[in-house]
A protein has these predicted regions:
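N-terminal Rossmann-like dinucleotide-binding module
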Residues: 1-46
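Hydrophobic residues in well-ordered beta-strands that form the structural core
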Residues: 13, 52, 92, 117-119
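Well-formed, non-transmembrane alpha-helical positions, independent of function
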Residues: 19-22, 41-42, 57, 82, ...
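Short loop/turn motifs at secondary-structure junctions
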Residues: 25-27, 47, 63, 140-143
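Short active-site oxyanion
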Residues: 27-30, 65-67, 117
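Beta-loop-alpha module in the N-terminal Rossmann-like domain of NAD(P)-dependent dehydrogenases
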Residues: 46-109
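A contiguous active-site-proximal alpha/beta segment in oxidoreductase catalytic domains
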Residues: 97-145
């Protein structure tokens, strides 16, 4: 059973937690929110025992093996790096980072700490995305006339 935490208490986090619960392989053990009241409200719905308003405290906790990051996009990279550097597996909502340099740094940090880094980017798995990939290319761009 993988013990995981969530950063963010929004609708997408709720969907992720419900899907993870259905798999029977994951247990939500910690919730982070800037507001203790928000964390408590979310935690009550899922019987979670560990609440955090400090990311550093959560990263240093022995209550989690992985974290699901669903915070505002601008925070994703810094939060990802924090947890990877504490040897905690990371599932991060898209976008993982704001540029290729940050993505490369996150990948390097995951490798260095021997943990999994996963960007939740479902669009690449959708049929219409595969159709776009199958279209002929013209130079470095696709053209539609």
């Amino acid at each position: 059973m993988i013990r995981f935490a969530v950063i963010g208490t929004n609708w997408i986090t709720r969907q992720f937690v419900e899907a993870a619960h259905e798999s029977g392989k994951y247990k939500l053990t910690a919730v982070y929110s800037r507001s203790l009241e928000q964390a408590q409200h979310f935690a009550n719905d899922f019987s979670v025992e560990h609440l955090f308003t400090s990311l550093e405290a959560m990263a240093e906790s022995d209550a989690i093996d992985a974290v699901y990051i669903a915070s505002p996009n601008a925070l994703h990279f810094a939060q990802t790096q924090l947890f990877l550097s504490h040897k905690i597996h990371v599932i991060c909502e898209k976008p993982l980072a704001s540029n290729v340099t940050e993505v490369d740094a996150a990948i390097a940090c995951a490798r260095e700490n021997q943990v999994v880094l996963f960007e939740a980017f479902k669009t690449a798995s959708l049929p219409n995305f595969h159709l776009l990939r199958s279209l002929p290319t013209f130079g470095s761009a696709w053209r539609n006339k």
